Swiss-Prot record:
It comes from Saccharomyces bayanus. InterPro entries: Pet122. Keywords: Activator, Membrane, Mitochondrion, Mitochondrion inner membrane, Transit peptide, Translation regulation. The keyword Membrane applies. Required for expression of the mitochondrial gene for cytochrome c oxidase subunit 3 (COX3). PET122 seems to work by directly interacting with the small ribosomal subunit to promote translation initiation on the COX3 mRNA. One of its GO terms (cellular component) is mitochondrial inner membrane. One of its GO terms (molecular function) is translation initiation factor activity. It comes from the Eukaryota. This is Protein PET122, mitochondrial. The gene is PET122. It is a peripheral membrane protein. Its main location: mitochondrion. The keyword RNA-binding does not apply. Pfam families: PET122. Residues 1-8 form a transit peptide.
Length: 260
């Protein structure tokens, strides 16, 4: 059992903090927390505060509880709550938090179990935390790193998942946007980063859905049908039999008449 060196929060303060959280007054709850820096929350209260802060997208409270209570005491946080926290952090531009949530989940061994349902749930949580980490990196480095670096992070986190789960463009809007930014730069190295990833790179791609996802992102940003045909032709020269579900959706949504 973990030893707690800080005194537990008093009953009166605990009640006020719980009431503020349940009533949706997260700024008030955060103020109480900051006034009680030397006091420790019990695990039940901690999860309640985190859950309410997440439901209300109050990222300041999430970050404060994370850095001042969860990490110092190495407390376990339920996997689905971690996923929701990561989503809030992504959209509120606390872009270093998702990677920390993933590391915490992996270090604590959360969600591991022997039953099939426990295993499926653990895989779903792992997928979501990795996905948000990829998206946070793409969003935070949109204009400061090359597309190839974002793609490398994607492969490290998503391409290596056991079972090769489907990877769909709709789940990676920030990465798709990064492909568009690279295209707008019209720099040779960036254009190469988009097209040379189709088979002319040292990185090993394992999941059959990874390269089609990149293809779909490129197709979403090409200027017109002529360029789309060229990209598709180049892709087909390198690969056969890969799922082109997303590519077909993108082509249809863009109004291109191309046989995939």
């Amino acid at each position: 059992m973990l030893s707690i060196t800080r005194r537990l929060m008093g009953t009166d303060v605990r009640s006020r903090l719980l009431l503020s959280s349940l009533n949706g007054d997260m700024p008030g709850a955060l103020l109480l927390l900051r006034q009680q820096q030397q006091a420790s929350m019990d695990v039940e209260l901690l999860h309640t505060v985190l859950a309410r802060a997440t439901a209300l997208a109050h990222v300041e409270t999430i970050a404060y509880v994370w850095y001042h209570h969860v990490q110092p005491r190495r407390l376990a946080v339920e996997g689905r709550l971690l996923c929701d926290m990561a989503g809030v952090a992504l959209h509120q531009d606390k872009l270093f938090l998702p990677a920390q949530f993933l590391q915490h989940h992996q270090t604590m061994g959360l969600g591991r179990g022997t039953s099939a349902s426990a295993s499926a749930e653990a895989q779903a949580v792992e997928f979501e935390l990795r996905r948000v980490k990829v998206e946070a990196f793409a969003r935070g480095t949109m204009h400061s790193t090359a597309l190839s670096e974002k793609w490398k992070v994607f492969l490290q986190e998503m391409d290596t998942l056991p079972g090769q789960p489907p990877l769909r463009l709709r789940d990676f809007p920030q990465l798709a946007r990064a492909v568009g930014v690279a295209a707008q730069l019209q720099q040779p190295q960036e254009q190469a980063a988009a097209l040379a990833l189709f088979g002319r790179q040292p990185l090993v791609v394992k999941n059959e859905w990874s390269l089609p996802l990149l293809l779909s992102a490129v197709l979403w940003h090409v200027p017109g049908p002529a360029q789309a045909r060229r990209v598709l032709a180049e892709f087909r020269q390198c690969y056969r039999g890969l799922p082109l579900t997303d590519a077909e959706v993108v082509i249809k949504r863009r109004g291109f008449e191309i046989d995939t």
